[in-house]
Amino acid sequence: MANIKKYAPIIHEGVPDLNPESVAYREFWDEQIERCKNGYKPNGMDAISGKHYYYLNFYKILGNSGEKGGRKSLIAPWYRDMDREYFNLFETCKDEGKGMIVIKARDKGFSYMNSGMLAQEYTFYP
């Protein structure tokens, strides 16, 4: 579990408390924009796409925080290998100008992933 936290540093480490006028502040946000656009590869781990990085770090979904009997609330998405495969396949199809059909069960988070991809696209490519 500790390793997958590397995919979502904003969620697990937070945003550093930097002076908005400082060079360090600008460099931090430039790095986040770069990761959201072009993807991210933590040391010793597989790369994730920019859309997936944005989804894991800056998007919120309605879900259970893990408490028994708790109500759903806005949470950060969890990293799942299945999601990484979906985001990667989406990028491949987009690059090749092809469509995609997915056979899946209900309640697997695909509506959230797709809306996250739209939010990333709208945020960085208006």
Q: Where in the sequence are the language-model features?
A:
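Phosphate/NTP-binding elements of NTP-utilizing enzymes
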Residues: 1-126
